[in-house]
Amino acid sequence: MKQNIFKSIADLRFAIFILLVIAAFSVIGTVIEQDQSIETYKLNYPLTNRVFGFLSWDIILKFGLDHVYKTWWFITLILLFGISLLTCTLLQQFPSLKIARRCQFFRTTQQFCRLNISTNLKHLSFSQLLFKIKENNYSIFQQKNIIYCYKGLIGRIAPIIVHFSMIIILIGAIIGSLSGFKAQEIVPKTETFHIQNVLNNGQFTFIPKVSVRINDFWITYTKQTTITQFYSDLSILNIDGNEIDRQTIFVNSPAKYNGIDYYQTDWNIIGLRLRMQDSSIFQYPFINLPNTQEKLWLTWISTNQQLNDGLTILIDNLQGYCSVYNKVGKFIGNLELNESLKIENPITLIDILSSTGLQIKADPGILLIYLGFLFLMISTLISYITYSQIWIVQDKNKIFIGGNTTRATFEFELEFLKLIK
């Protein structure tokens, strides 16, 4: 009974069926936005106008379609697929490899009829034939007048490595799903933050109590004032606030520390500091203008104590200046850092306050996934090694010779013809 169950699990058709089910749910997880707020699903999948006539936000939440890859049933499918690969390896691949390593001698000439290519020779001596076979790097086994030869046995290991690598990838995916996390932080320059805004995490996720300080943030521009890259200089701090590591990150070049990756994703301008005529310093917040093709920030500052007159300041970059307009919208001029604006009550621009957007990710299973893909690439290369077999039986004055190969049949036939010439 148990043996039949294991044979069914090890069956290729069962593995393909499970793989198709996993692929189908993966498509669902791609189509339906993952790890979004309930309001997002209520907006996109309302009860009154169901998608495809049946799909609404309550069904999505009920069956966990908002976090497909972390549900118990999806992880169970992955485990079942892994068990199928493992049992197939143990019950089919290893026995097949053991058989391939055995000396499979032919005892009768009738056995040559089932080979892909075979013939009988009269003009070629037995020792001369063995010498040619040896020159072609075959391993030769002999019992009196019968010979068995093979080469490329390592090619038979490729399916085992494929299964092994896929199991490693599945284990890595499960570990990442259960214990990884993704967070996002918007942090002003010179501020220190802890990981708090977690977007998604697994059942066994541990959020480390690490402190990170944003030392600096800057943007590089082309001559046409378009952005080429933006950078964040950040420091990893210990519990005492002392720096233990410092790295500069930019887009597609994250900082890595203790299994956590810090990615540069966004930026913002949050305010500016101005020095007034009486040397007092004021900080004004910026408002990001929506529905604009390019990023644009705006603020208003009062120029008198009655708050009935003031200036509008616009900024769209971090190149160290902003544009100033009066109360009727007339352009007055650009105000640069440490420069004073000559008006009735002069003001000096001290600093433009910016913030950096970071995405923080941890995936403990990613190394296993990379390792699995490495073995998968190795198995692909190994699979190109052809496993070839040759049988020889000497019967009186005749030499019967035949062979089989797993792939590259044409090349094997050419090699075979050269052997019997």
From Swiss-Prot:
BP terms from Gene Ontology: cytochrome complex assembly
Keyword Acetylation tagged: no
Listed InterPro entries: Cyt_c_bgen_Ccs1/CcsB/ResB (IPR023494), ResB-like_domain (IPR007816)
Entry annotated with the keyword NAD: no
Sequence intervals crossing the membrane: 12-32, 71-91, 157-177
Compartments, record wording: Plastid, Chloroplast thylakoid membrane
One GO CC annotation: chloroplast thylakoid membrane
Protein origin, superkingdom: Eukaryota
Keyword set, alphabetical order: Chloroplast, Cytochrome c-type biogenesis, Membrane, Plastid, Thylakoid, Transmembrane, Transmembrane helix
Bilayer topology: Multi-pass membrane protein
N-terminal signal peptide: none
Pfam families: ResB
Location, primary (coarse class): plastid
Family of this protein: Belongs to the Ccs1/CcsB family.
Subunit-structure text: May interact with CcsA.
Function: Required during biogenesis of c-type cytochromes (cytochrome c6 and cytochrome f) at the step of heme attachment.
PANTHER family in UniProt: CYTOCHROME C BIOGENESIS PROTEIN CCS1, CHLOROPLASTIC
Protein's name according to its UniProt entry: Cytochrome c biogenesis protein Ccs1
Organism expressing this protein natively: Thalassiosira pseudonana (Marine diatom)
Lineage, uppermost ranks: Eukaryota, Sar, Stramenopiles, Ochrophyta, Bacillariophyta
Gene: ccs1
